[in-house]
A protein has these predicted regions:
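Extreme N-terminal starter segment of soluble prokaryotic enzymes
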Residues: 1-6
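Short polar catalytic/cofactor-binding loops
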Residues: 10-16
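Active-site catalytic loop in hydrolytic enzyme cores
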Residues: 63-66, 88-196, 262-265
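CN hydrolase (nitrilase-like) catalytic-core segments centered on the catalytic cysteine
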Residues: 63-82, 148-246
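Cys-nucleophile CN-hydrolase/nitrilase-fold catalytic domain and related Cys-dependent amidase chemistry
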Residues: 18, 27-112, 174-199, 203-206
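A conserved C-terminal secondary-structure "cap"
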Residues: 256-293
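Short beta-strand scaffold segments in enzyme catalytic cores
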Residues: 82-84, 95-99, 133, 226-228, ...
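Short amphipathic alpha-helices and their capping/turn segments at secondary-structure boundaries
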Residues: 23-37, 155-164
Length: 293
């Protein structure tokens, strides 16, 4: 499969209302099926809402939760990514993304970088994930899943691309700065994200699929603006700011091959060099440097 139809589920989840949010997801799945979608992506914590605080434990699910499997069965025939609060066997809570395929929960990724600045307080409630790897999908393409803040840390897109990802998928609950500027054609947060994603797409020669939620929680506005960037860093599709909906676009996976042939950055990458230098830097920070040049 070289052409993939991608759907961006730019939803407005209800805070703490899992049943209502499951219904939103099921409706979007039905709509996506009617549009012959191959890859359907929902936002970070789409099943729960974002500003949960003490509601986290109430809305958390284990990865074998029947409700997740019901979603997976409903989405059979598509590769679907959903955001939820995961409860581990050790009763730790994580912000997570599940890849649903062929009626099963195929893969679960836990958010690696938890912001604790401004209005963000994620470390108070969640554990940080300790695994980052790309995953093969039924589409014949390797996906690299990450969540919101992860994309603001260089190792995440770099490692996923080194692990063979052809599509980087970032699901987000990004609140907006300068929301009043939308009517003037701008939004500070959206502009920052757009620059970030175009840069990573070019440097990794991957497609970037970014899905951000919309809606308001406790006076915090989430701006949407979900988009798809091609491996050359060009915007393939950008959803409207602040509007909910299911937005569909097509991508050609041959663009990855063509761009990597013309610009072989991954071929020329030196992970062993990076690893050696990181080991040196870690030793230096621990006061164990050996004066090696």
């Amino acid at each position: 499969m070289t052409s993939i139809r991608v759907a961006l589920g730019q939803l407005a989840p209800r805070l703490g209302d899992v049943a209502a949010n499951l219904e939103l997801h099921h409706r979007a799945i039905d709509e996506a099926r009617g549009k012959k979608v191959d890859l359907l992506v929902f936002p970070e914590l789409g099943l729960t809402g974002y500003l949960l605080q003490d509601l986290n434990a109430e809305v958390a699910m284990r990865r074998d939760d029947e409700r997740l499997h019901d979603l997976a069965k409903a989405a059979a025939g598509m590769s679907t990514i959903v955001g939820f609060v995961e409860r581990s066997d050790e009763e730790q809570l994580y912000i997570a993304a599940a890849l649903l395929e062929e009626g099963e929960v195929r893969h679960v990724y836990r958010k690696s970088y938890l912001p604790n600045y401004g209005l963000f307080d994620e470390r108070r409630f969640f554990g940080a994930g300790s695994q980052l790897r790309a995953v093969d999908s039924r589409l014949g393409v390797r996906l690299g899943l990450c969540i919101c803040e992860d994309f603001w840390h260089l190792p995440v897109p770099y490692l996923l691309a080194e692990d063979g990802a052809q599509i980087l998928v970032n699901i987000s609950s990004s609140p907006g700065r300068d929301v009043a500027a939308v009517n003037d054609g701008g939004l500070g947060t959206a502009n920052s994200w757009r620059t970030l994603m175009r840069t990573y797409a070019q440097l990794t020669t991957c497609f970037v699929v970014f899905v951000n939620r919309v809606g308001v929680e406790e006076s915090v506005t989430f701006w949407g603006g979900s988009q798809v960037i091609d491996p050359a860093g060009d915007v393939v599709f950008e959803a409207p700011l602040l509007d909910r909906g299911l937005f569909v676009t097509d991508i050609d996976l041959d663009d990855v091959r063509r761009e990597r042939t013309a610009l072989p950055l991954l071929r020329d990458e030196r992970p062993e060099f990076v690893l050696h230098q990181l080991e040196r830097i870690t030793r230096d920070h621990a006061g164990l440097g050996d004066d090696e040049q």
